[in-house]
């Protein structure tokens, strides 16, 4: 089998996440259908580096493709893009070594975008609309600083009791950085870590925004929950504001 690394971008609005599912439109499912059509039912396998959730977008998703033959990559890329929906596109395809490991990630970078200005119908699919006063960047940054570093994130995850009890998923994680900036009149919150748990970023974002508004959760309660104490906060920021920006592999 030949191995290829695909860089994929997509508008996740109309898809039920990354993972292929029967009778449901997903990013991996659409990619597999396109490859199957182009290769005329050749044997292949795809593995994504990040399992983005329903409604989440990406500009740098990485996909390992195992394929039984070595195609001309420029023609292969064009053919796959022609077979894909308009909201999913292959940016690049390159051959990689046989020992390449799609899980050998140095870090992943996600961003969450908030529009605290006038509603924009053209960008609405990619941002959270903020119905309050303009956001104070420094004040919001101070709240997000609580989440930086190594913490127990089980209460800021979408893991159910069975998953938590199995101990198969590590919930003590380190977030390297969270940066709150204003870009093109939007508030952009950028997260960097080796990996994230399901719903982790969206639960952090909504908790921080609620804390910013002095609603439902305080800074002290956030600190307690980051020690695994108490209950899960029952809020989750909308998926449409979240985007996978970058995946960097170890050398």
Swiss-Prot record:
This is tRNA pseudouridine synthase A. Substrate binds at residue 110. Keywords: Isomerase, tRNA processing. It catalyses: uridine(38/39/40) in tRNA = pseudouridine(38/39/40) in tRNA. Homodimer. Pfam families: PseudoU_synth_1. It comes from the Bacteria. Belongs to the tRNA pseudouridine synthase TruA family. GO terms for biological process: tRNA pseudouridine synthesis.
């Amino acid at each position: 089998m030949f191995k290829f690394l695909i860089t994929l971008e997509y508008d996740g609005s109309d898809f039920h996440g990354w993972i292929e599912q029967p009778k449901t439109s997903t990013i991996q499912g659409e990619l597999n259908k396109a490859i199957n059509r182009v290769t005329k039912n050749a044997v292949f396998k795809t593995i994504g580096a990040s399992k983005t959730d329903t409604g989440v977008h990406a500009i740098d998703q990485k996909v390992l493709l195992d394929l039984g033959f070595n195609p001309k990559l420029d023609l292969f890329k064009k053919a796959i893009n022609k077979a894909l929906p308009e909201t999913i596109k292959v940016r690049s395809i390159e051959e990689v070594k046989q020992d390449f490991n799609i899980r050998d990630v140095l870090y992943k970078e996600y961003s969450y975008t908030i529009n605290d200005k006038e509603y924009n119908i053209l960008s609405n699919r990619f941002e959270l609309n903020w119905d309050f006063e303009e956001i104070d960047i420094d004040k919001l940054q101070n709240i997000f600083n609580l989440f930086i570093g190594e913490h127990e994130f089980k209460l800021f995850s979408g893991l159910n009791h069975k998953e938590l009890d199995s101990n198969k998923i590590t919930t003590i994680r380190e977030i390297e950085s969270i940066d709150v900036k204003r870009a093109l009149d939007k508030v952009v919150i950028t997260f960097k870590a080796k990996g994230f748990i399901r719903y982790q970023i969206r639960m952090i974002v909504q908790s921080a925004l609620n804390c910013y508004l002095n609603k439902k959760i305080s800074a002290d309660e956030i600190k307690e929950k980051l020690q695994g104490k108490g209950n899960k906060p029952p809020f989750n920021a909308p998926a449409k504001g979240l985007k996978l920006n970058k995946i960097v592999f170890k050398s």
